[in-house]
């Protein structure tokens, strides 16, 4: 996939990071584009969106990805990770989609204002969200049949609303958020395939695809649980690209 929506006057590029490989690939594509285009010279700001209960493992994964990018693209200006936390307070009796959207929007907007207030008002900021939609219905069905588990709570997230701009409160304006993979209807099945073709296996290995839901009960945040949607999705995707 080619990233083309980078304004030439962009000074600060925010990359929304999670512990999954799709956000790492978005980071890679942006850094590669900047490294190859002399007209672009923004600072890349990795912005980790983390559940407060999983913060340690997510920060560790993001740290590995940032180190990978700095080594791969030494001439690209990559800042330290900026953290946005939200509390894992999803009420199971509410719509999961509504709860998650509310958490991410409210916490993300409020906490982003801290670092936005530290950069000059004449900065040109853009943000890139590397999230993908869940698998297509056909592939979702095949994955569930393969593992014998249903993940209806993730199906409910398909097509959820996305924030397309971020308010910059201290400046009284907004800046755009690009959802490049979602706009191209890419799922992690296609992202994984592109990463393999580019030989980015070690980058994939630096990420973790897991909701870490079981980690709260076991107090083990060091390895995937093996039973959540994201674990099943990655295992099924690997089989498709074997």
Where are the regions that the model predicts?
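Nucleotide-activated chemistry modules centered on ATP-dependent adenylation/adenylyltransferase
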Residues: 1-242
């Amino acid at each position: 996939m080619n990233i083309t929506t980078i304004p030439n006057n962009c000074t600060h590029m925010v990359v929304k990071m999670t512990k999954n490989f799709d956000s790492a690939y978005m980071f890679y594509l942006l850094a590669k584009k900047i490294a190859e285009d002399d007209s672009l010279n923004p600072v890349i700001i990795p912005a980790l969106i983390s559940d407060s209960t999983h913060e340690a493992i997510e920060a560790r994964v993001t740290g590995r990805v940032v180190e990978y990018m700095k080594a791969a693209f030494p001439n690209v200006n990559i800042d330290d990770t900026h953290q946005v936390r939200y509390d894992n307070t999803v009420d199971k009796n509410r719509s999961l989609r509504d709860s998650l959207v509310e958490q991410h929007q409210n916490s993300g907007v409020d906490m982003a204002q801290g670092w936005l207030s530290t950069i000059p008002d004449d900065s040109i900021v853009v943000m890139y969200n590397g999230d993908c939609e869940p698998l297509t219905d056909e592939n979702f069905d095949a994955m569930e049949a393969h593992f014998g588990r249903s993940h209806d709570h993730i199906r409910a997230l398909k097509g959820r609303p996305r924030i397309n701009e971020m308010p910059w409160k201290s400046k009284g304006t907004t800046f755009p958020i690009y959802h490049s993979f979602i706009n191209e209807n890419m799922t992690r099945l296609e992202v994984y395939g592109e990463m393999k073709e580019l030989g980015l296996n070690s980058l994939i290995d630096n990420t973790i695809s897991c909701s870490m839901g079981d980690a709260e009960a076991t107090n083990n945040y060091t390895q995937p649980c093996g039973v959540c949607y994201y674990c099943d999705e990655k295992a099924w995707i690997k089989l498709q690209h074997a």
